[in-house]
Swiss-Prot record:
Molecular function GO terms recorded: proton transmembrane transporter activity
Regions crossing the membrane: 239-259, 354-374, 437-457
Name the UniProt record assigns to this protein: Proton extrusion protein PxcA
Free-text function comment from the UniProt entry: Required for H(+) efflux immediately after light irradiation to form a rapid H(+) concentration gradient across the thylakoid membranes. Together with PxcL, contributes to transient H(+) uptake following dark to light transition.
Signal peptide: none
Domain of life per record: Bacteria
Topology in membrane: Multi-pass membrane protein
Compartments it resides in: Cell inner membrane
Pfam family, one: CemA
Record InterPro entries: CemA
Keywords tagged on the record: Cell inner membrane, Cell membrane, Hydrogen ion transport, Ion transport, Membrane, Transmembrane, Transmembrane helix, Transport
Family named by the database record: Belongs to the CemA family.
Gene designation: pxcA
An example Gene Ontology CC term for this record: plasma membrane
Species, as recorded: Trichodesmium erythraeum (strain IMS101)
Length: 477
């Protein structure tokens, strides 16, 4: 008996409806099978550990095969979970009362049994999360939460977890390590991959922007990104203040407490009393200062300004000409002797201060190293913050900063600045100033620094911001 076209059409619609309603279960099963295959590879070839290149004695070809299989299964999990989430939300909103009661028995049983399978669905999703999350978590997950490359919340679903893993595992093994150097290599590799799109990038960006503006979750996403940026800024500023202020406070506290006490007591010992000056430069400065003071006394006495220097002479009502020369010289010698004692105490304190600075700076350096080593998460956040600030500048601003720094440290007038810096450093530590060392340093270090600047511009800035390099060359010319 022939079936009428209307019944054939109605049966086709029912079959299509049945196929569509089985889409969530079908997609979940495919994702579950892919997760099972990943787990099988882990147990058979990696002793139950995650698939990686660490401490596994396989050849490069074998490792490449395992990685390709891992990427394939992770991609299946990503796509099928996206299909599951989309289809389950659509199927759940359908009005069950409008479904034709005459559809086949299998479809009716499926609709009745599907709500009771929630525990099975949850078990499968939990297993998929357990397998795929191993390739999402890294050894420093907290530091990567605020990284600019990671825009996914910590409590994301399996789709977000797998998506981040696929993006990392799509590259060779030697760029999938957790260190910052490998992250830089990964970014460099991504930048070298040619992007051959049929449509222009500007048009695609416009479509993407319109899509984001029409997204009902766009406002929530903007607020989330703003809060994330705010937390990143506050964390970076707090870390900068911590790195600067804590070593300075430790330096001052140690100088006025135990370090200062120990140095002062040691330098006041009898065998140290004879050493008035820490180095020959201090002694030369003290002698010049004493000689200038003596010449000043003679000069003012000849000009009749002695009342300020010798008030005891004028209490008796005598003039300078009435005082014998030998007596005047004796008074000047007495003043010079008193001044010499003051200068000796002054330069003795300067020498002690230089020794204190050596120990206190060493303690501050240890404090700085401890802060850096114990605050790696804040250090990663600061690095991300500085990247945002630097790469957020315009090309003209970048070129201006580069020219300012190069002219300041390696430019024509930089030797005078380096000379002042070296003199202050030697005085800070109480060391003798060496003109030969200063000239040698000025002749070599700025040249090395200039070579480093040029290499950085050629190697990195020329790739990340070619327009900034062009602007820099035009401004420098």
């Amino acid at each position: 008996m022939a079936i009428s076209p209307w019944k054939q059409f109605k049966l086709s619609v029912l079959n299509a409806n049945q196929w569509f309603r089985k889409t969530p279960e079908r997609a979940l099963n495919m994702a579950y099978d892919a997760a099972n295959k990943i787990r099988s590879i882990e147990e058979e070839h990696f002793e139950g550990r995650k698939i990686s290149n660490v401490s596994i004695s396989y050849s490069n070809s074998t490792k490449s095969y395992f990685n390709s299989q891992l990427n394939r299964y992770l991609k299946i999990i990503q796509v099928r979970l996206a299909e599951f989430n989309t289809s389950i939300s659509v199927v759940g909103t359908l009005d069950q009362n409008k479904v034709d009661k005459q559809k086949d028995k299998f479809d009716q049983n499926y609709q009745q049994e599907f709500p009771g399978r929630s525990s099975i669905i949850l078990d499968k999703l939990e297993f998929i999360d357990q397998v795929s999350s191993r390739y999402y978590k890294s050894s420093n997950h907290e530091a990567q939460e605020l990284n600019t490359d990671l825009e996914i919340p910590h409590s994301s679903s399996s789709i977000a977890i797998v998506s981040s893993n696929v993006n990392v595992n799509n590259y060779p093994n030697n760029v999938r390590a957790g260190s910052s150097q490998n992250q830089n290599n990964l970014a460099e590799l991504k930048s070298n991959i040619p992007n051959t799109n049929f449509l222009p990038r500007s048009l695609l960006k416009t479509f993407k922007k319109i899509k984001q503006e029409l997204d009902p979750e766009a406002e929530t996403e903007v607020i989330r990104k703003f809060r994330k940026s705010q937390i990143k800024t506050l964390t970076s500023v707090r870390f900068i203040l911590l790195v600067i202020l804590v070593p300075l406070l430790i330096h001052q506290l140690s100088k006025i407490t135990f370090v200062g006490y120990l140095v002062d007591n040691f330098m006041s010992l009898p065998h140290q009393q004879a050493e008035l000056f820490l180095n020959s430069n201090m002694e030369e400065e003290a002698l010049v200062k004493l000689h200038q003071y003596e010449e000043k006394l003679h000069f003012k006495m000849y000009l009749g300004q002695a009342p300020e220097l010798f008030p005891e002479l004028y209490e008796s009502g005598k003039e300078i000409t009435e005082i014998p020369k030998s007596e005047r010289e004796e008074l000047i010698e007495h003043k010079v002797e008193k001044k010499a004692q003051e200068i000796a105490l002054e330069y003795k304190a300067k020498g002690n201060n230089g020794i204190k600075n050596i120990f206190c700076d060493f303690i501050s350096l240890i404090t700085f190293v401890i802060i850096i080593s114990t605050r790696k998460r804040e250090l990663e956040v600061l690095k991300s913050f500085m990247d945002d600030v630097v790469y957020g500048l315009s090309d003209s601003a970048k070129a201006f900063i580069i020219i300012l720094l190069t002219d300041m440290f390696v430019g024509f007038h930089s030797p005078h600045g380096w000379e002042v810096i070296l003199e202050n450093i030697t005085r800070h530590f109480g060391l003798p100033e060496s003109r030969d060392f200063n000239f040698l340093f000025i002749a070599t270090f700025p040249v090395i620094l200039d070579a480093v600047f040029k290499y950085w511009i050629f190697r990195y800035l020329n790739r990340s911001s070619p327009s900034a390099v062009a602007t820099y060359k035009n401004m420098n010319e």
